[in-house]
Amino acid sequence: MAAAVTWIPLLAGLLAGLRDTKAQQTTLHLLVGRVFVHPLEHATFLRLPEHVAVPPTVRLTYHAHLQGHPDLPRWLHYTQRSPYNPGFLYGSPTPEDRGYQVIEVTAYNRDSFDTTRQRLLLLIGDPEGPRLPYQAEFLVRSHDVEEVLPTTPANRFLTALGGLWEPGELQLLNITSALDRGGRVPLPIEGRKEGVYIKVGSATPFSTCLKMVASPDSYARCAQGQPPLLSCYDTLAPHFRVDWCNVSLVDKSVPEPLDEVPTPGDGILEHDPFFCPPTEATDRDFLTDALVTLLVPLLVALLLTLLLAYIMCFRREGRLKRDMATSDIQMFHHCSIHGNTEELRQMAASREVPRPLSTLPMFNVRTGERLPPRVDSAQMPLILDQH
């Protein structure tokens, strides 16, 4: 009975843990070529009651990845400023991403070490309505990417941009951090921001003001350090500080001509005036060339060998001829030198002079003995005792 009472709470806790690890699933509808922003709120993962607010000291971090893959798709990005702030999944799907994708999000509670999972089912379809062939991209240096992702600042940017564009519906196409486009991390100084690229599309043509800003003359002034050509009032200031030297306009109203598919040929340029076809090469016999290349050096080496042998064997001077060409006085002097040398060698070998006694080994000066002393010198001290 006591064992059953002990196991009941343990099984209840295990079942509760299994129930918590079950991932929630949320279905989201996306459009190709339109910006997608999904906030990762702390309240969604903490599962608090509606009337209970999220404590400001709760720290949550998120990890998102494509199901079956270690990372997110190429078009989708994740950002979170700190564990106290919510995270964001944002991006713009491409036509190749059409269909559905499953994103798994795991939230980690840095205080209680709890783990919560959520599954996002992204249904990506084609946009409805008119096309947006006129697209403009602006670099906003006064904001970070997570400051523009919420709905309120994004709508405020579109409203302010409407004063520079012709009347029409403006839609956000993409939002990209400047760090992802090669920007530098700003210094930790107040007022310094990373910057964000905002891409906007519309069905109405560009205004004269935007065309002048993106003209080559305006870019030339920016390259010289001068302000760009902005002929209208900047309605984006002071809420958004736009770098007007980094404005790009893309007009897709005129379809690009399709590249002609080259027709594969035989690879022979017959009608090219600069093409000189090679002539037919006749068959050649290289036996003669090979024999000349091998035999001529061998014959030359053989002739040189015979010439050297003749000179060394048959053209030598000889001792008799050399002695006959030498005078008698010189020959007598030479012979006397050899004779005296031999005589001195014989005298040195025949003399037997006794060696000095001091040079003999182990000679005793007091006794005159030539034999080694009876006392073993190895056992005698080097310095005798003095009395």
From Swiss-Prot:
Keywords of the record: Cell membrane, Cytoplasm, Cytoskeleton, Glycoprotein, Membrane, Phosphoprotein, Signal, Transmembrane, Transmembrane helix
Pfam families in the record: Sarcoglycan_2, Sarcoglycan_2_C
GO cellular component terms given for this protein: cell-cell junction; cytoplasm; cytoskeleton; dystroglycan complex; membrane raft; plasma membrane; sarcoglycan complex; sarcolemma
Residue ranges that the UniProt entry lists as topological domain Cytoplasmic: 315-387
Extracellular compartment segments: 24-293
Residues that carry a glycan: N174, N246
Modified sites of kind Phosphoserine: S377
SUPFAM superfamilies xref list: Cadherin-like
Transmembrane intervals: 294-314
Family per similarity comment: Belongs to the sarcoglycan alpha/epsilon family.
Quaternary structure and interacting proteins, as annotated: Cross-link to form 2 major subcomplexes: one consisting of SGCB, SGCD and SGCG and the other consisting of SGCB and SGCD. The association between SGCB and SGCG is particularly strong while SGCA is loosely associated with the other sarcoglycans. Interacts with the syntrophin SNTA1.
Job of this protein: Component of the sarcoglycan complex, a subcomplex of the dystrophin-glycoprotein complex which forms a link between the F-actin cytoskeleton and the extracellular matrix.
Protein name according to UniProt: Alpha-sarcoglycan
Species this chain originates from: Mus musculus
